[in-house]
Amino acid sequence: MRRDFDRRQKANAVRKKVEYSKRLNENRIRVLQAREDAVQALLRDAQASLLSLSLNTAEYSRLMLSLIVEGMHKLGESPALIRCREIDVPLVESLMPQVEAAYRAAHGREAPNVRLDTANPLPPPPRNAEEQSSGERVFCSGGVIVTSSDGSIECTNTLDDRLRIAYMGNLPALRGMFDT
């Protein structure tokens, strides 16, 4: 009878430890999920900011000038092709004289020959923030891709890619902000 009582008592203690461990793990999972939800909310806010940035004509124009010059410098090839969204074609065309001057000023040499690749535009922007976060279709919030004339070398300077790179590079720090 004593052995039976001890066996039941040990089984009861094991069951309590298992229950405690199960509750502890469930709480850990809830905390991790809440932290991941908060990080994803930050990403969605940043994506929404990209949408509004491309609507601010003056600021977006300055940004596009910088992105094109930077892409041309990184590529280091001549001639080069610039790909942009269809809605950005007039802007990029109007920036071409400024691009050459900015490149010359920044790098102290003549700008490479570039032309706009209108045959292969980047995807259009998302219509709203919900579409942007849904992932149902490919979109581009702005920026350019500068490629070599044969397309073998590509410098992606789109806002979405820059956000993705910044997000991935800072993900540990972002998650750390929500540690308890």
Q: What do these predicted ranges mean?
A:
Residues 29-180:
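Elongated, mostly alpha-helical coiled-coil "stalk/stator" tethers of large membrane protein machines
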